[in-house]
Every structure is written in C-alpha cells, then in structure tokens.
Amino acid sequence: MRTSHIATWLGTCCIMVLLMVFVGGVTRLTNSGLSITEWRPVTGVLPPISDADWAKEHEKYAKTPEYLYINSGISLSDFKRIYMTEYVHRLLGRILGIIFFVPMLYFAVKRQIKGALAARLGIVALLGALQGAMGWFMVKSGLVDVPYVSHFRLAAHLFLTILLFSLLWHSFLESRGVVAVHKVTHGKYIFAIFMLVITVLQMVLGALVAGLDAGLIFNTFPLMDGDIIPSQILSGELLTGKFLYNAVVVQFLHRFFATVVLVGAVAIPLLMRFKESWMLCFGIVLQFLFGVATLVHGVPLYLASLHQIWSFVVVALEVYILKVIRKV
C-alpha cells in the first residue's frame, strides 16, 4: 500500500511536469512569456484583480522592449490574455512544487523513502528550485535590451525539465516494481543509452530552433528550399564560433539529428526484438512525422505543442527500455 501511494504521488508529479511543458510551449508560441515583468514566488500567487491592478501591470509591461518594439499600443484585453497564459504557467510551477514537496516530507518522516530513491528525489528537489530560478533568468533576458529571451537560456530551461522529468519517471517505474526482464549484450545496452542521449540533444536543439524562430524558415521537406545543405552552411557558417546564433544552421542541425534518431528508432527493434522496442520505434517515427508536419505547415500552435509534448513521451519510452534491460 505504501509503495502504491508513492507510485501515485510520483505519477502525478510526472503528469504535472508534462502539463507544465504543454503550457510552457503554448506560452512561448503565443509570445506570452514576457508579459509578467517581475518574479514574485510568494506574493505573485494571485493575479491582478481590480482594474487598478491590471492598469499597473500593463504600465510595467509598457516599459519592456517587447512592448516598445513589437506590441506597442496593445489593448488591455489582449494584454490580459498573454498575461494570464504566463500566469497559468507560473501557477502550475507553484502547484507542482506543493504536490512534490509536501508528500515527500510526509513520506520522509514516515521513513518510506530511503536509499537510492531518497537521493534521487533530493536531486529532483534541487532541480526544481534551480528550474524556477532558470525560468526567471530566461525571462529576464528579454526584459532588458531585446524583445525576446535568450535561446540558450530557453534551451537550458528545457534541459532542466528533461532531467527533472526523467528522474521522476525513473522513480515512478521503480516504485511500480518495473525491473529488468530482457537480457542484452553490452553493445546493445550502450546503444539504448546512446538513443536517450541523442534524443535529449535533439530536444535541446529543438529549443534553440524555437528560441530563434528557426521553424519559420525553410518550410519545405526533405530539402531546404531545394538544397540538401543550405548555401549558408556550405559557405562555412557551421565552422564559425557563433553558428548556434544562426537560424539556418540550427534548423539544419535539428533536421540532421532528427534523421539520426529516426535511423536509430528503426534499428532498435531489429537489434532487441521485444515489445517495448517496437513501442519506442513507433513513438519516434510518430515524433518525426509531427516535426515534419509542424515545419511544412509553418509552426501552427496545435502541431508545435504536440511535437514538443510527444518528445517527452519518447524520453519516457527510452527510460523505460533502459529500466527493463540488463547487460549479460
């Protein structure tokens, strides 16, 4: 029963993280992330209530680069819409913190969390605190001189989320009694790890694509406006020290590693030949198709959101496979 309670708690935390990822993606895609100009973890729990409160928040926003260069003259009703989108994202973060920390303290006092699980959840707690700070660090980059957040900070924000989700998911699987049932060679085990690493790298590149709005260029597939490799890259752009600032290069890299992951997805069931490997193959192929559809349709909200959230499903499948295999 105790294990069941812990599993339910950890499963709820995983779902909450995915919900935060979804809302965070919507926040990014609707350009709502810079609407709240302060970080008030405690006093910012409630949104503006009165007309005077809303006018005050609108006045603060009117001093930001985004307002001055992009949204000058935005109506109060439109401002409320983007403000509430960002507010919901931050509120979910607070709720997730409560859902995680309160039960963890209870289970710790009852001595139901021990050993490796306790250490792992301690890391999750630290990552959660760091993630909140990173979120504000990211937003702050778009409130000073330029009307957009640093794409590197956006990528770091996502990377921390991936780590946090992976640790929670691994802990959930463990609490559910998931154990290694498939024997694989050392090489196949390393390949499974490689697939997880390359997927995470691809997700981070996806964040860079989002941060640079690189999905809004070269909306053709498989060629990039008629070329396999764009002329900007052939001219040596990839070799410069600032290639990750170039939207063309970043989109090309995202395409390239998507192909690498896809090839790996096809190889996994051929190498391992058990049910879970086919599930992963299907999940990655679906993610690849979501990515292509998002690109060629000009990054619509519903497809881009699906593409982002499904990447976490792929990570969950890869962590699951690493949990059910063992080296022989």
Swiss-Prot record:
Residues that, per the record, bind heme: H254, H307
Keyword Cell membrane: yes
E.C. number(s) listed in UniProt: 1.17.99.9
Catalytic reaction list: Fe(II)-heme o + 2 A + H2O = Fe(II)-heme a + 2 AH2
Record GO cellular component, one term: plasma membrane
Tree of life domain: Bacteria
Cofactor: heme b
GO molecular function: metal ion binding; oxidoreductase activity, acting on NAD(P)H, heme protein as acceptor
Function statement: Catalyzes the conversion of heme O to heme A by two successive hydroxylations of the methyl group at C8. The first hydroxylation forms heme I, the second hydroxylation results in an unstable dihydroxymethyl group, which spontaneously dehydrates, resulting in the formyl group of heme A.
Cross-referenced HAMAP family: HemeA_synth_type2
Name listed for the protein in its UniProt record: Heme A synthase
Organism name: Anaplasma phagocytophilum (strain HZ)
